[in-house]
Amino acid sequence: MPELPEVETVRRELEKRIVGQKIVSIEATYPRMVLTGFEQLKKELTGKTIHGISRRGKYLIFEIGEKDRLISHLRMEGKYRLASLNVPMEKHDHLALKFTDEQLIYADVRKFGTWELISTDQVLPYFLKKNIGPEPTYETFDEQIFREKLQKSTKKIKPFLLEQTLVAGLGNIYVDEVLWLAKIHPEKVANQLTESSIHLLHDSIIEILQKAIKLGGSSIRTYSALGSTGKMQDELRVYGKTGEKCVRCGNEIQKIKVAGRGTHFCPFCQQK
C-alpha cells in the first residue's frame, strides 16, 4: 500500500511530467471510481489545463483550470503511468486523462482507489471532514498537541497512529519502522507512554517519513511510483524482517497481529 512517501514521490513525478498538459478527453472502463460522477468529471475537465499537483496526507490533488480540484486516493494498489495515445487500456486500467500526445492511466487491481472532483473552496472543508492530522514536519507536527492526544487515549499505539488523526501519512510499513526506532511496543497503550517516549516517537515519525521521501519511498511487492523505483526498502529495519536479527540488539524480529495488521517488532528493544 502506498504511504505518504510513495504518494509524495508520485506527486513529484506527476508535477514534472504532466503540469501544463491540456486534457483533451477522459476515458473510463470503471466509472464508479469517480465518486462525484464520471459524466460530470468529463464535462468539467475536458479542455482544461493541469496547473499543479499537490498532496495532503495520502491524497493527491490535481489542480485543474481556475477552480477545479481532482482528489485522488490510491488506496491499496492504485498506480499511475504515462503511455502514448495508441496504447490500449489493459485489464486493470480503469481511468485515463488523455492529453495531446500521451495519456495518464490509472490502474488499480482491487478497484479501491477513488477520484473526486471538488472546487478550490471545498478543499479545506473536505480535509477537515476527513480529520487528517498534520503533515510530518517539524513546522506542522506540534509535539505538545501530539502529547496531549496520546495522554488522553487508551488505544494501542500502532492502530492509533494508523488512524491518520494524529499525523498524516503513516501506513503499516512506516508505523513498524517508527515504533522500532522509538523503541515502543506496537501494543503499548497510548496514555502509558512516558514524556521521553512521546518525544522520541514524535521525532522518529518525522525522521522516518522524511528519509523515505528523500529515498523515493519503498518499492516492494507490486508497488512502484509512476514506474520509478524507490530505495527506502533497503533501509527498513523491521518490516518484512521476520526471523532476522535486529540490527540494534541482535535478537530475532517477530511478527504478530495488532488490530488485524501484520506487525513486525523486536521483543527485546520494544518491550511492553
Swiss-Prot record:
Coiled coil region boundaries: none
Gene3D superfamilies on file: 1.10.8.50, MutM-like, N-terminal (3.20.190.10)
A single GO molecular function term of this UniProt record: class I DNA-(apurinic or apyrimidinic site) endonuclease activity
Keywords assigned: DNA damage, DNA repair, DNA-binding, Glycosidase, Hydrolase, Lyase, Metal-binding, Multifunctional enzyme, Zinc, Zinc-finger
Source domain of life: Bacteria
Presence of the UniProt keyword Repressor in the record: no
Cofactor: Zn(2+)
Enzyme Commission designation: 3.2.2.23, 4.2.99.18
Any matching Pfam family: H2TH
Catalytic center residues: P2, E3, K58, R261
InterPro entries in the cross-refs: DNA_glyclase/AP_lyase_DNA-bd, DNA_glyclase_Znf_dom_DNA_BS, Formamido-pyr_DNA_Glyclase, FPG_cat, MutM-like_N-ter, Ribosomal_uS13-like_H2TH, Znf_DNA_glyclase/AP_lyase, Znf_FPG/IleRS
Zinc finger motifs (FPG-type), residue ranges: 237-271
Keyword Nucleus in annotation: no
Catalysis: reaction(s): Hydrolysis of DNA containing ring-opened 7-methylguanine residues, releasing 2,6-diamino-4-hydroxy-5-(N-methyl)formamidopyrimidine; 2'-deoxyribonucleotide-(2'-deoxyribose 5'-phosphate)-2'-deoxyribonucleotide-DNA = a 3'-end 2'-deoxyribonucleotide-(2,3-dehydro-2,3-deoxyribose 5'-phosphate)-DNA + a 5'-end 5'-phospho-2'-deoxyribonucleoside-DNA + H(+)
GO process terms (BP): base-excision repair
Binding site for DNA: H92, R110
Role, per record: Involved in base excision repair of DNA damaged by oxidation or by mutagenic agents. Acts as a DNA glycosylase that recognizes and removes damaged bases. Has a preference for oxidized purines, such as 7,8-dihydro-8-oxoguanine (8-oxoG). Has AP (apurinic/apyrimidinic) lyase activity and introduces nicks in the DNA strand. Cleaves the DNA backbone by beta-delta elimination to generate a single-strand break at the site of the removed base with both 3'- and 5'-phosphates.
PANTHER family xref list: FORMAMIDOPYRIMIDINE-DNA GLYCOSYLASE
Family of this protein: Belongs to the FPG family.
Subunit structure, as described in the record: Monomer.
Name assigned to this protein: Formamidopyrimidine-DNA glycosylase
Organism the protein comes from: Lactococcus lactis subsp. lactis (strain IL1403)
